[in-house]
UniProtKB/Swiss-Prot annotation:
This is Mannitol operon repressor. Keywords: Repressor, Transcription, Transcription regulation. InterPro entries: MtlR-like (IPR007761), MtlR-like_sf (IPR038026). NCBIfam families: PRK11001.1. Disruption phenotype: Inactivation of this gene leads to the constitutive expression of the mannitol operon. Homodimer. Can also form higher level multimer aggregates. Signal peptide: none annotated. GO terms for biological process: negative regulation of DNA-templated transcription. Involved in the repression of the expression of the mannitol mtlADR operon. Does not bind the operator/promoter regulatory region of this operon. Therefore, seems to belong to a new class of transcription factors in bacteria that may regulate gene expression indirectly, perhaps as a part of a larger transcriptional complex.
Length: 195
């Protein structure tokens, strides 16, 4: 009788574990979405995106290594330290890509985001989300299904024209925020060496 009761309870435990995992996933996605949405300029948006990407990659890299305290303190931390061989985000990305933890599209998207952020660090110009210098690279990201097409502007009515431009900029920005939220969430929720 006790065995039957335990068998009956097990599916509920699995359900509650799945629900807890789904809630954690949703909470993480919400945090990423909020942080990306807070960036009002292209520069702040990309800085935040690469910071979140770095956090996601760091979680994956740590899964690859042993978990005992001695190994972490004396072997893993020096590798990941700023001047260690895995101190650079690009090197950590290559490691998890080479180990098959992330796929080629995720790897290429991460590298492109880092390159775009680096380019903006050296460029003193402020760009809008709809500038060609931003739309071009974002259009190459695998995580972006499609950027919204530019509307056919009617410059005759200046208030309508301004509204159309603002609406288009917001649509492009929202597409970028949602696409990068999905990319970063997918990477951070991966489990090393599990299919």
């Amino acid at each position: 009788m006790v065995d039957q009761a335990q068998d009956t309870l097990r599916p509920n435990n699995r359900l509650s574990d799945m629900q807890a995992t789904m809630e954690q996933t949703q909470a993480f996605e919400n945090r990423v979405l909020e942080r990306l949405n807070a960036g009002k300029t292209v520069r702040s948006f990309l800085i935040t995106a690469v910071e979140l990407l770095t956090e996601a990659v760091n979680l994956l890299v740590l899964q690859v290594f042993r978990k005992d305290d001695y190994a972490v303190k004396y072997a893993v931390e020096p590798l990941l330290d700023g001047d260690g061989p895995l101190g650079d985000l690009s090197v950590r990305l290559k490691l998890i890509y080479g180990l098959g933890v992330i796929n080629r599209q995720e790897y290429e998207d991460a590298e492109l985001l880092m390159a775009l952020r680096e380019e903006l660090n050296h460029d003193g110009n402020e760009y809008a989300f709809t500038d060609d210098e931003i739309l071009g690279p974002f259009g190459e990201l695998h995580c972006v299904a499609a950027l919204p097409p530019p509307p056919q502007f009617e410059p005759a009515d200046s208030s309508l024209y301004a509204m159309q431009i603002q609406r288009y900029q917001q649509a492009v920005r929202s597409t970028m925020v949602l696409s990068l939220t999905e990319l970063i969430s997918k990477i951070s929720l991966k489990k090393a060496f599990q299919k």
